[in-house]
């Protein structure tokens, strides 16, 4: 059956080649003869035409065709007759005549080619290109033209770019275009200028779209009188210039991001000779202006030289169909003909088209043919007959298939071997053996799935096992108006909620009555699907990993049903960092405090991410693509961060600490560790590097420690990060600088990060400072005391008494004396005052705040580096002591 279809396809292709070769043979020759390129602009194809019907001979018509001259910028071929097409190629011999030039500032100028002097000029409006960008240094969304010959639109969002499926004009027609919180709008404005080619006077100007108060009114003064003068019988030549401005503007929730304009021109030249009604289009030019141009040659349109007394005959016509405003033409008049011998001259009695010239001409040969006219009669019947035969063969092939199925069903009761019941002629045993030979396929994943359930090891116990075979998908209608597809237990809705790499798309769906997010992957990437399914099963039941409820597959795709979440961490940060939505009253989400520090909610979300990494690393799984877009926020209950998108994750074998140099999957640009960019060995430390970037991203409302997206990878390799923006949070600087260490061996473990002072609660901070004070009060170790006293300059600036309120100084002076230059005395003060907090007066309690939150904030706001500096000293001297081990978990791993 397949061979028969292949033969039919080859017959169709051969018929198409024969059809096209005969039909367009002459057109192809003419196109090859006229092929040329311009270094000024790109001339579109097909070229515009102006049809002039024949006046005396019925059925004959004349057609003027605009097409590029070979090897000439802005020049066009002479017209050809539809009844007797000519193959003449006429080339200019010298630069005589005039030149229409377009400049970047929007000016049009007509220049005499002989004297090189301008004859006239006028402005068409603003400059041809504009590009205005917001002053925001963290612009992470832009749409631009790639500058290639195809002029495709590129959309860049959060460091990743995608080629949009529209051209510029199509994209503007589709606007407004909404992506997340970004709104892009477009406009197209066309302005028409009708200009006297001799004087440069604007006869008429019109722009679309226009304001309502301008509709019906003249856009240029004295337009009616100028139009009357153009029709008064003077031998005026006309140039029609159409300027089209395409503008794109984008904003992010009302805040302007960028806008730019691209301009294109269309110019048409009409010659009026001897009589007011004698008008013909002699040339046409189109050119696209690049969206950003600072300098360069002007765009040119060559006009005919009318200084010659020689003339050729132009046929009379009754109307000009391409220009509605022009009046009927009268009997034939003579146009100026270039000087020289053996030029082409066509008589009006021959019903042929005159060669309306651009510049002077050189001799040319003319050859006429009627092959195009004869085609419709010679090839119409054979083509129809061939199509009829192929349709009959296709129907016959389908009939044979149905007959075969009928025979199999008829003989089914008489068959003893159940293997022969497969209508495809393949036994079930053979199919299973063939499937078992697939490597890294979904079958292996399913077997691993079942094995984990049987072992009862606590991982993946709640996930339902799936069938090895692919299901047939059926379309279903849902009560909420959505359409969907049913694949096994899974229903995939048509509503798309996200996209990923390798053709991955995420849809809304339901699995066994539960709302889920359905991740659809191509079966050609089944190794990615298998890896993600395997690692999701292994990490199931952890609250900080997105749960997988099951998976299904059909002939084309693999569908993974995942826990439905509210949004990604990137979406949450971007939304709440915008002033109208940040810390909005009446909502239960507050990510940053009034002083700009991360709130308890945001600290919990970051701690959830760390907890998820701790769980993966404990199972030997390296995520390898950690970024805000791959961290999801739970939909139900309090905010909780969950790790997702484990398509390129890697599970280490026992006793392994890294992936080889040839490991596949290298994460996302801007979030990869330097060893990933260099394709080196990949250990758990690559997740810690990405975590450092993610923590910085959360604290700074979407900033990145390595700058803008286009420079991040280079700065990561060169270790050029900037933490200045978080300098007011010393604990964050201490942690992030460790996580971004270029040496993976020096990066801390995920367990260490989870217990770092950056994530400590106020109660734990106060407990650590009090335990440290108790420790140094009972010791005579000079090394420890000297180390603590050595941080006084960085911790409080040598005199901590200057930064305390007078009421607190008066209260502490009643009991004992303190040295304002001693770190040990400052820690003693914190320990004593926290222990006697209940004895304070109401005024002093109000000054210090509640215990422990307000109390810790009072001292940390005055001595921001005290906690982290004391932590560094105690980590070096006392981290192995039992009393301090709870503060330094994971630091020695």
From Swiss-Prot:
GO cellular component: endoplasmic reticulum membrane; IRE1-TRAF2-ASK1 complex
Name by which UniProt lists this protein: Serine/threonine-protein kinase/endoribonuclease IRE1
Cytoplasmic face of the membrane: 398-893
Domain Protein kinase: 491-759
Known partners and oligomeric status: Homodimer; disulfide-linked. Dimer formation is driven by hydrophobic interactions within the N-terminal luminal domains and stabilized by disulfide bridges.
Region (Disordered): 451-478
GO biological process: IRE1-mediated unfolded protein response; mRNA processing; response to endoplasmic reticulum stress; response to unfolded protein; RNA splicing
Pfam families documented for this protein: Pkinase, Ribonuc_2-5A
PTM statement from Swiss-Prot or TrEMBL: Autophosphorylated.
Coiled-coil residue windows: none
Membrane topology: Single-pass type I membrane protein
Keywords: ATP-binding, Disulfide bond, Endoplasmic reticulum, Glycoprotein, Hydrolase, Kinase, Membrane, mRNA processing, mRNA splicing, Multifunctional enzyme, Nucleotide-binding, Serine/threonine-protein kinase, Signal, Transcription, Transcription regulation, Transferase, Transmembrane, Transmembrane helix, Unfolded protein response
Annotated active site: 625 (proton acceptor)
Extent of the signal sequence: 1-19
Transmembrane spans: 380-397
A GO molecular-function descriptor: protein serine kinase activity
Catalytic activity: L-seryl-[protein] + ATP = O-phospho-L-seryl-[protein] + ADP + H(+); L-threonyl-[protein] + ATP = O-phospho-L-threonyl-[protein] + ADP + H(+)
This enzyme's EC code(s): 2.7.11.1, 3.1.26.-
Organism: Oryza sativa subsp. japonica
């Amino acid at each position: 059956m397949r061979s028969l279809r292949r033969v039919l396809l080859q017959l169709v292709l051969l018929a198409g080649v024969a059809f096209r070769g005969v039909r367009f043979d002459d057109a192809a020759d003419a196109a090859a003869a006229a092929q040329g390129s311009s270094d000024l602009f790109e001339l579109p194809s097909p070229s515009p035409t102006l049809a002039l019907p024949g006046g005396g001979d019925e059925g004959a018509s004349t057609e003027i065709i605009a097409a590029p001259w070979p090897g000439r910028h802005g020049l066009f071929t002479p017209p050809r007759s539809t009844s007797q097409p000519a193959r003449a190629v006429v080339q200019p011999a010298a630069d005589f005549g005039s030149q229409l030039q377009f400049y970047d500032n929007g000016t049009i100028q007509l220049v005499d080619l002989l004297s090189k002097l301008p004859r006239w000029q006028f402005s068409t409006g603003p400059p041809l290109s504009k590009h205005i960008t917001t002053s925001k240094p963290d612009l992470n969304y832009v749409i631009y033209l790639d500058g290639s010959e195809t002029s495709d639109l590129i959309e860049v969002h959060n460091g990743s770019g995608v080629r949009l499926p529209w051209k510029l004009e199509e994209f503007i027609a589709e606007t407004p275009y909404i992506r997340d919180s970004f709104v892009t709008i477009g406009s197209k404005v066309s302005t028409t200028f009708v200009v006297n080619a001799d004087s440069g006077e604007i006869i008429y100007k019109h722009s679309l779209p226009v304001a309502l108060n301008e509709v019906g009114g003249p856009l240029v003064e004295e337009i009616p009188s100028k139009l009357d003068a153009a029709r008064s019988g003077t031998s005026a030549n006309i140039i029609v210039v159409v300027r089209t401005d395409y503008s794109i503007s984008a904003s992010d929730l009302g805040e302007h991001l960028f806008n730019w304009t691209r301009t294109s021109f269309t110019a048409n030249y009409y010659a009026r000779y001897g009589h007011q009604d004698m008008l013909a289009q002699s040339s046409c030019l189109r050119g696209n202006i690049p969206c950003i141009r600072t300098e360069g040659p002007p765009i040119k349109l060559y006009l005919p030289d009318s200084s010659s007394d020689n003339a050729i005959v132009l046929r009379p016509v009754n109307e000009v169909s391409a220009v509605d405003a022009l009046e009927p033409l009268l009997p034939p008049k003579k146009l100026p003909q270039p000087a020289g011998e053996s030029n082409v001259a066509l008589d009006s009695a021959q019903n042929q088209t005159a060669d309306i010239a651009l510049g002077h001409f050189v001799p040319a040969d003319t050859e006429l043919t009627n092959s195009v006219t004869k085609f419709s009669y010679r090839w119409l019947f054979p083509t129809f007959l061939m199509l009829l035969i192929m349709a009959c063969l296709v129907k016959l092939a389908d009939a044979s298939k149905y007959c075969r199925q009928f025979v199999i069903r008829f003989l089914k009761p008489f068959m003893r071997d159940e293997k022969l019941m497969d209508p495809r002629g393949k036994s079930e045993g053979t199919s299973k053996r063939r499937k078992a030979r697939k490597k890294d396929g979904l079958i292996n994943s399913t077997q691993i799935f079942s094995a984990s359930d049987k072992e009862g090891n606590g991982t993946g116990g709640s996930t339902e096992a799936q069938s090895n075979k692919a299901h047939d998908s059926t379309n279903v209608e849902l009560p909420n108006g959505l359409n969907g597809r049913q694949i096994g237990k899974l229903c995939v809705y048509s509503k798309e909620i996200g996209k990923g790499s390798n053709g991955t798309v995420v849809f809304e769906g339901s699995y066994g009555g539960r709302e889920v997010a359905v991740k659809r992957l191509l079966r050609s990437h089944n190794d990615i699907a298998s890896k993600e399914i395997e690692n999701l099963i292994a990490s199931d039941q952890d609250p900080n990993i997105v749960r997988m409820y099951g998976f299904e597959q059909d002939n084309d795709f693999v569908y993974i049903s995942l826990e439905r979440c509210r949004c990604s961490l990137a979406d949450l940060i971007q939304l709440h960092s915008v002033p109208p939505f940040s810390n909005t009253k009446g909502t239960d989400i507050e990510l940053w405090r009034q002083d700009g520090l991360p709130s308890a909610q945001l600290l919990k979300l970051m701690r959830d991410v760390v907890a998820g990494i701790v769980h993966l690393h404990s199972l030997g799984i390296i995520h390898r693509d950690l970024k805000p877009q791959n961290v999801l926020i739970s939909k139900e209950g309090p905010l909780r961060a969950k790790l997702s998108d484990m398509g390129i994750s890697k599970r280490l074998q026992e006793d392994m600490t890294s992936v080889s140099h040839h490991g596949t999957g290298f994460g996302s640009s801007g979030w990869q560790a330097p060893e990933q960019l260099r394709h080196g060995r990949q250990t758990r430390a690559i997740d810690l590097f990405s975590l450092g970037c993610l923590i910085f991203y959360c604290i700074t409302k979407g900033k990145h420690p390595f700058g803008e997206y286009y420079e991040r990878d280079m700065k990561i390799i060169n270790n050029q990060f900037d933490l200045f923006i978080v300098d007011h949070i010393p604990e964050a600087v201490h942690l992030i600088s460790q996580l971004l260490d270029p040496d993976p061996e020096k990066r801390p473990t995920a367990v260490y990060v989870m217990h770092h002072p950056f994530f400590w609660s106020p109660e734990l901070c106060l407990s650590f400072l009090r335990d440290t004070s108790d420790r140094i009060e009972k010791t005579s170790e000079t090394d420890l005391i000297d180390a603590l006293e050595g941080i006084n300059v960085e911790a409080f600036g040598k005199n901590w008494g200057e930064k305390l309120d007078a009421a607190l100084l008066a209260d502490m002076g009643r009991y004992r004396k303190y040295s304002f230059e001693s770190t040990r005395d400052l820690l003693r003060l914190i320990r004593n005052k926290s222990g006697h907090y209940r004895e304070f007066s109401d005024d002093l309690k109000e000054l210090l705040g509640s215990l422990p939150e307000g109390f810790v904030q009072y001292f940390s706001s005055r001595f921001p580096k005290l906690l982290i500096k004391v932590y560094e000293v105690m980590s070096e001297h006392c981290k192995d002591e039992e009393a301090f081990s709870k503060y330094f978990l994971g630091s020695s791993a």
